[in-house]
Regions:
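Long, ordered, helix-rich scaffold segments
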Residues: 1-221
Length: 221
């Protein structure tokens, strides 16, 4: 069963505090890292509060994996800007930094950043990993305006026909994760309605594509 919306915030704060406590108290480095990752994931999803400075500390830390997770979380909540993200990317210089930065830039919760991210997705010029990272960033963002998935859903068959199966699957699955938020139940219904409409109007679409869409519809019902 799901908790009522009004009861969730208190539980989230308890969960965040518990994961940090366990990360600090465990003597196992792998367990500490796992608890810290869980804490950062919770922060990315539900936002600023008493733990913001702690996340900023991880973002500036020496553990590159945790640092980029924290940077992406800060970006998704609008607590860092594009200049800060590109500075981190350029200072790192690795391929992983390129991927993380693409995710962080796409997750910035402002209209211009989202428009730029969607434009790059539609351009067809992204690598598999950067495409997935960009779509993951769009999905992770705290942006509460139009998710932009309408046009992306409309383009699914076109994208499928013009790209490899692997990239097409990344596109479709990534697009269908954008804009869903259990704290806003209407987003699930809107996506489900859009997918049903797409199925009705694309009866001749490739069978594998239709199957992926049907599977997502089933999971949302």
């Amino acid at each position: 069963d799901y908790l009522p919306g009004g009861a969730r915030q208190g539980l989230r704060e308890l969960l965040s505090a518990a994961t940090i406590r366990y990360a600090r108290e465990t003597g196992d480095a792998d367990a500490a890292r796992a608890f810290t990752r869980a804490f950062i994931t919770e922060f990315e999803a539900y936002g600023p509060g008493a733990f913001t400075e702690l996340v900023r500390g991880y973002a500036a830390g020496d553990d590159i994996d945790l640092a980029w997770r924290a940077r992406c979380a800060l970006a998704a909540r609008g607590l860092v800007d594009a200049d800060g993200i590109t500075a981190w990317r350029d200072a790192d210089g690795s391929g992983e930094a390129q991927r993380h930065a693409a995710r962080a830039l796409a997750s910035l919760p402002d209209a211009d950043s989202r428009a730029g991210a969607w434009e790059s997705v539609f351009s067809g010029a992204l690598s598999n990993d950067i495409l997935s990272a960009t779509l993951a960033g769009l999905a992770a963002s705290s942006w509460e305006g139009d998710a932009g998935t309408g046009a992306a859903i409309d383009r699914m068959e076109e994208f499928w026909q013009s790209h490899t199966i692997g990239m097409s699957l990344r596109y479709v699955r990534g697009v269908l994760a954008v804009g869903l938020d259990i704290d806003r139940p209407g987003t699930v219904a809107q996506t489900l309605d859009a997918l049903r409409a797409w199925l009705d109007s694309h009866e001749g679409a490739p069978a594998q594509l239709r199957r992926v869409v049907v599977e997502h519809c089933d999971s949302y019902e």
